[in-house]
Amino acid sequence: EEFEAYLLEILSEYQVSIPEYGTIKALSKPIVIITSNNTRDLSDALRRRCIYNYVYYPKKELELEILQKKLPNIDLELSRQIVNFVQNLRVQDIEKKPGIAETLDWAAAISGLGLKDLSDNYKVLHSTLVCLLKTEADKAVISPEIAQKLAKI
């Protein structure tokens, strides 16, 4: 709500108030683009003042490409397994679907723990899911058995 009020001030008055500095007015009308993956609802007031665009999760091929560029030391086959797992996790009935940042964090954790294959150690696999699952409810939904199934798909 505080962030939304901040955005409304910028979009309505073309200025921003910063307690330490005062009010800063735009010299020209700003162009503001807001992207979303539906992690929060935006008010009608905010939607009226901007172009609102939904950003879909990347397709498997693009996510794999991003993973390989950001973490080039991870084996290609393990990278494929990681991306497949995350893509399959996103279709599960969870509140907070993991984004690219979570995929990268999880891949780094998996690699850092020395896993060469997601099926190497399901206990370690499940313990690292905290990188992907951000709510207690989601952690309850993705049991060790479900994680194991997702790793095999």
State each model region's role.
Residues 1-153:
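C-terminal regulatory/interaction module of P-loop NTP-utilizing enzymes
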